[in-house]
Amino acid sequence: MVFETSKATSYLKDYPKKDGLSVKELIDSTNFGGLTYNDFLILPGLINFPSSAVSLETKLTKKITLKSPFVSSPMDTVTEENMAIHMALLGGIGIIHHNCTSEEQAEMVRKVKKYENGFINDPVVISPEVTVGEVKKMGEVLGFTSFPVTENGKVGGKLVGIITSRDIQFHEDNKSPVSEVMTKDLVVGKKGISLTDGNELLRSSKKGKLPIVDAEGNLVSLISRTDLQKNQDYPNASKSFHSKQLLCGAAIGTIDADRERLDKLVEAGLDVVVLDSSNGSSVFQLNMIKWIKEKYPELQVIAGNVVTREQAALLIEAGADALRIGMGSGSICITQEVMACGRPQGTAVYGVTEFANKFGVPCIADGGIGNIGHITKALALGASCVMMGGLLAGTAETPGDYFYRDGKRLKTYRGMGSIDAMQQTNTNANASTSRYFSEADKVLVAQGVSGSVVDKGSITKFVPYLYNGLQHSLQDIGIKSIDELRENVDNGEIRFEFRTASAQFEGGVHGLHSYEKRLHN
């Protein structure tokens, strides 16, 4: 018997269940054991929209929302201020490592917060008596030569002019006070002006800076044309709702010295703190969460790492605003091998998120992210964001210098549990010994390795590649947003398929003598 083609979809109801597996059937360890991202696929859905219509907005914590689900890992070969700045500009967030002194880490946070301000509340200000020569020297140090001039040389003083590079470029007498050459006919904005109106006034005035003054003419802040250009180039930038500054995260440990470290980070403008531990279910972390919530109730706290719902429950109950999932799944991590402790990442992500999402606590899948497909799978299993170390390693924004080996341009990438990282700084400032509870150990036991990765170029190209690729991936599944993805996974509409070893081989490049794998143009 041949069925009528015009009624093909109606015959689907004759099947006892939909094609593929539900997420609960997939994550059934009695059938498949622990799963990694490579062990399964997501079945495709109906496409009736362009990939550009897919929203990647997601929750980082209970109170912080990002335009893209990308977080850079707090590793000393991945995230310092340069990476954090560009991750925020591209819609994600960077978590600055703490394998350094507290002063150094706070200064990195400060640089991120000052990098792009809607209103620059603490601009460099000079007095009328400052000489042209002094301004030129300031320009060499600071990288710019445009400064507001107030009567007392401070923010809050009466604005009397602005000195710019054009004013001093061809002025040969370096002893002249800036009062003789500064621009006195100024276009200003009044205190209380909106950022939108301020930017429009700056645009129409064709000036480089727009001073904001109060009713008495005292300088209160500044808007910069360079910041306006950045706003145009990075429309998805992650910014504070109140200050319009870039969002910035930083990691700390759970020892007493980290409480003083956090004080300095908060003073620098920190938005979210990550409690950095290989095993988050410790009394040290529970006590740290409670202390932070008492002293800084508005500061968002990401706790972890965890891989079981029992671990998650302790941290949620203590007050965590988000959880970080993963133990031993990173490319440079050997925790599972050395400690016999951990969990396959796919199983861990679903096990924890299924529980944590009931309490409105977002989860970050940390480790094992090697490509766009892994990101999609982590989100499908319930994660709100993915934390990336190895995937971002080797980009221009990571710390360190490039070097050449065997004709390849490389950068160092190491695990925070590697011996190199553990010996980087003294005990009190070392993130690695704290992270792996090794501060008092005479013999350090490595839980990570040191290596090198090939140059990936700038994340200003690489992260947009991840963003667009993720949009296309969700389009193939027939989903328009991360929230819709989670909803349809939970209700069984989105289906999965377990992959055998031969299926994984089939899904990769095969049968070629040679090939070139270019990820993007």
From Swiss-Prot:
UniProt keywords, alphabetically: CBS domain, Cytoplasm, GMP biosynthesis, Metal-binding, NAD, Oxidoreductase, Potassium, Purine biosynthesis, Repeat
Compartment(s): Cytoplasm
InterPro entries: Aldolase_TIM (IPR013785), CBS_dom (IPR000644), CBS_dom_sf (IPR046342), IMP_DH (IPR005990), IMP_DH/GMP_Rdtase_CS (IPR015875), IMP_DH_GMPRt (IPR001093)
Binding site for NAD(+): D276, S277, S278, G326, M327, G328
GO cellular component terms listed in the entry, alphabetical order: cytoplasm
BP-aspect Gene Ontology terms: cellular response to starvation; filamentous growth; filamentous growth of a population of unicellular organisms in response to biotic stimulus; filamentous growth of a population of unicellular organisms in response to starvation; GMP biosynthetic process; GTP biosynthetic process; symbiont-mediated perturbation of host immune response
Enzyme class, broadest EC rank: oxidoreductase
Cofactor needs: K(+)
EC number: 1.1.1.205
HAMAP family cross-referenced by the UniProt entry: IMPDH (MF_01964)
Name the record gives this protein: Inosine-5'-monophosphate dehydrogenase
Lineage: Eukaryota, Fungi, Dikarya, Ascomycota, Saccharomycotina
This protein's encoding gene: IMH3
